[in-house]
Structure formats: C-alpha cells, structure tokens
Amino acid sequence: MADPWNRGHGAVDDMLDAENKRMAENLASKVSRLKSLAYDIDKDAEEQNAYLDGMDSNFLSATGLLTGSVKRFSTMVRSGRDNRKILCYVSVGLVVAFFLLYYLVSRMQN
C-alpha cells in the first residue's frame, strides 16, 4: 500500500520548487533592471565628465583672453595723460557694447 505521507511530501516539494523558480525569476528580473540602471548611470556620468572637460578648456581660453585684455588696458592706463581721452572713449564704448549685446540677447529670447 502506498504511504499517503509520501504523496503529500511530493506535492509540497513541487509547490516549494515552483515557488523557488518564481522567486528566482523575480530576482533575476530585478537584477537585470539594476544592471540596466547602473549602466545608464555610468553612461550619464561619462557624458557629464566629457561636458565638464570641455567647459574647463573653454574657461581656460576665456581666462587667457581676459588676461590679455586686462594687460593691454593696464598698459594704456599707465602710459600717461595723452591716452586719457582714448581711455574714456574705449571705456564708454565697452559699456555701450555691453548694453547693446544685453538688449539683443534679451530681445532674441523673447
């Protein structure tokens, strides 16, 4: 005669095996989503680093340009009274150019 307990253990084992497979598939899908997320974060970080490196070189070139302009302006200021009139014209011209550019940029944004 067949033992009724053995049949019960087989059903429990099958049920536990099916639940383990379901949980393993669930875990595998979560791991795959986490891998995808980690890859996206890594790719985004690399893109941002490249962007920041480009900004660094742009700032360095702007710094060099401004340094040269300040040196030339300082030389003109120290050169004497003859250039005071030119210095005033250049200063007024720079202020006017700044406001003109500001007006044009604000006009283009609207």
Swiss-Prot record:
Transcription is among the record's keywords: no
GO molecular function terms attached to this record: SNAP receptor activity
Location in or out of the cell: Golgi apparatus membrane
KW Membrane (keyword) present: yes
Stretches in topological domain Lumenal: 107-110
PROSITE patterns per record: T_SNARE (PS50192)
Record keywords, A-Z: Coiled coil, Golgi apparatus, Membrane, Protein transport, Transmembrane, Transmembrane helix, Transport
Membrane topology category: Single-pass type IV membrane protein
Protein's job: Vesicle SNARE required for targeting and fusion of retrograde transport vesicles with the Golgi complex. Required for the integrity of the Golgi complex.
Protein name according to UniProt: BET1-like protein
Name of the gene this protein is made from: bet1l
